[in-house]
Amino acid sequence: MKLIAFIAFLLILITIINAQGSIGSSSQSLSSEVDSSDISSSGSNSTASSEGSVSSSSNSGSQSTSNSGSEASGSSNSGSQSTSNSGSEASGSSNSGSQSSTDSSNSGSQGSTGSSNSGSQSSTDSSNSGSQSSTDSSNSGSQGSTGSSNSGSESSGSSNSGSEGSTGSSNSGSESSSGSSNSGSESSSGSSNSGSESSSGSSNSGSESSSGSSNSGSESSSGSSNSGSESSSGSSNSGSESSSGSSNSGSESSGSSNSGSESSSDSGSSSDGKTTCISFHDTLSINTVDDDEIECTGKGETRCISDNNYKCATKQRHGSIECSVNGYIRCTGSNIKCKIGNTECSIRNSRLDITEKPIFTRGPRHH
């Protein structure tokens, strides 16, 4: 009997213990439900201090106030570094891998200030496509310290397409220190285009220019220089060298010079009866000796062309004309018109007019 009572007591204890275990497990499940409802990690919509962002709002794993993997302090899109877009490094806004410290930088450009686009490097203003520029806009891989630089150009002004320049605009590989430089040109000031080098003014396509505009490989210190010309002032075109004025196509000139010519001065007339003109090749001098006389001298072959070679014609019957083949022509009269090479000389009331310039000469003749 005692054994039966003891077994019954054990069964009651086991029942009580089982009942307490079920109550504890139910309470634990309730507490776990409460804990899981409290924690709730959503992993979406996080502004500031989110993963991959330095400060401000960041989208898609970017670092900085930037978008898509960019590192920057301003706003940045698509993997850019800086206040930049698409992989660019900048403090302003930079697009597509550009590096820029201020303003906007696009597409891989590197720049400290301004906008930089597509891999350009720029310190100020805008830099586009891989250009390097310190100020202004730089486009497409240009390197520049100031101004705008495009496509790999270096420029301090504006530089386009691989140009190098410190100021102004530089395009396509040009180098420019000031002004604009285009396409590989080097320019210190002004504009430089396409590989030109220019210190001031504009330089285009590989030209070198210190001032003014220089185009296509020209070198110019001032004025405009085009296509490989060298010019210190004025405009120089196509491989010309010029110290002042305009120079075209390989010419050296202090005034204006065209097509490979060398000239210190062009034509000039005065009312006092003394006028001197120096041509491009044969250094032709045309002087008004007195009120009714013209004297033409040249170091090369000088021709007076009308109906026949070595012949001059007067509009009136009076007056005397001398023509020789050794480079000396003398015309006297009040109304005389003669051609020397492609130069037409006329004297009317002691005034000399030059309408055309000689193109070439065959050299001096000896007798």
Curated annotation (Swiss-Prot):
Residues 147 are annotated as: 11 X 11 AA tandem repeats of G-S(2)-N-S-G-S-E-S(3). Residues 1-19 form the signal peptide. It is found in: Cytoplasm. GO terms for cellular component: cytoplasm. It comes from the Eukaryota. Induction: Rapidly up-regulated by hyperosmotic stress, which is dependent on dstC. Strongly inducible by 8-bromo-cGMP and to a lesser extent by 8-bromo-cAMP. Not induced by DIF (differentiation-inducing factor, a chlorinated hexaphenone). Up-regulated following Legionella pneumophilia infection. GO terms for biological process: culmination involved in sorocarp development; endosomal lumen acidification; exocytosis; hyperosmotic response; intracellular calcium ion homeostasis; membrane fusion; regulation of cell differentiation; regulation of cellular pH. Residues 24-273 have a biased composition (Low complexity). May have dual functions, one in vegetative cells at starvation involving cell-type choice and a later function involving progression to the tipped mound stage. Involved in vesicle fusion in endo- and exocytosis. Involved in L.pneumophila intracellular growth. This is Protein rtoA. It comes from Dictyostelium discoideum (Social amoeba). The gene is rtoA.
